[in-house]
Amino acid sequence: MKKKILMGTMAICYGAMQAVACTGISLTAKDGSYIQARTIEAAAGALKSEYVIIPRGEEITSFTPSGVNGVTFTARHGVVGMSVVMKEFICEGVNEAGLSAGLFFFPHYGSYQSYDKSMNGISLGDLQVPTWILTQFATIDEVKEGIKNVRIVGLDASSVVHYRIGEPSGRQVVLEIVDGVPHFYENTVGVLTNAPGFEWHLTNLNNYVNLFPGSAPNQRMGDTTLMPIGGNSGFLGLPGDATPPSRFVRIAFYRATAPQLASAMPTVLQCFHILNNFDIPIGIEHSLGEAPDIPSATQWTSAIDLTHRKVYFKTSYNNSIRCIDLATIDFEKVKYQSHLMDPVKEQPIEQIMIK
């Protein structure tokens, strides 16, 4: 009975994730502080997002398609993460070493190894890969070695994700699993969205080689002078829809033209400011025939300071930025815990009193 309840819950969870849109960016400050930020959306349901604290020494067993019987691992590093749907599914987080890992929906293009019940002992559910990475490793190179010892399996055949992994040095890789084979790509453009594959997105950027920041110069056409109608005409043709290819191009150009700021905190705020342009409003993204509601919009935005081990987030219900500083947590003593990002779904409003 417990197994049926669990698998039913997981089926509902995956249903809620069937149209997740995510946009990610990374920026480095002049003092070397490295920030990774992202949005998350889900058109099919509320994500019941929580922030999760994992202490050192916590034992975790992965889900498989047949239950909670996959690979078991013990946390070597304390973790602060943000989960979707279930607290076990951390989709973005950072550990004490400053290693960050997150997942982005990747439908139709990725494919895991087929599930083999006889290999449960080394099977790792796809939505728990970030948790496994964050609790086990301190560097990207360690992840690349460690992944050889597990089989990443999908908990639902219709859902596939790819991963963004970063370290305080500013190095970032994208991990995509195709035909059961892990592929790591060095991410020097510093952005990520969803499908198609990462290499396809890089190739697609070549279609926009004509774009540049600022305004285009006046041009003569015979006896007529053509001039820009407004500012930013150099970006005329930059795609503005919410599809993953368009978001990838747009965030890549916004990152490339963003001024480098002095230190971590201004850069964190800059990430939030840039990602405001990728807030999906209620009504444009939802399942066919369903009334638009808050789940169809951007549900939360996060920024992680890998250098100083700080997690920042704001939500669709509360745009006030909140912060968790890993330096204030004793990961030897703290208990495993999770808390709703929005215990109260209400936006605080500061009243200005006029005298």
Locate the predicted segments by residue.
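Positively charged n-region of N-terminal signal peptides that target proteins for export
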Residues: 1-4
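Bacterial N-terminal signal peptides
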Residues: 8-16
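C-terminus-biased signal that marks the final domain/tail of proteins
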Residues: 20-35, 43, 49, 155-159, ...
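A contiguous strand-loop segment
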Residues: 23-118, 157, 355
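Structural recognition of the beta-strand scaffold that forms the well-ordered cores
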Residues: 35-37, 100-103, 164-166, 174, ...
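Compact, glycine/acidic-enriched structural inserts
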Residues: 54-67, 110-150, 335-345
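Aromatic- and glycine-enriched pocket-lining scaffold segments that form the walls
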Residues: 140, 144-177
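Acidic, His- and aromatic-enriched active-site or binding-groove loops in soluble protein domains
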Residues: 181-193
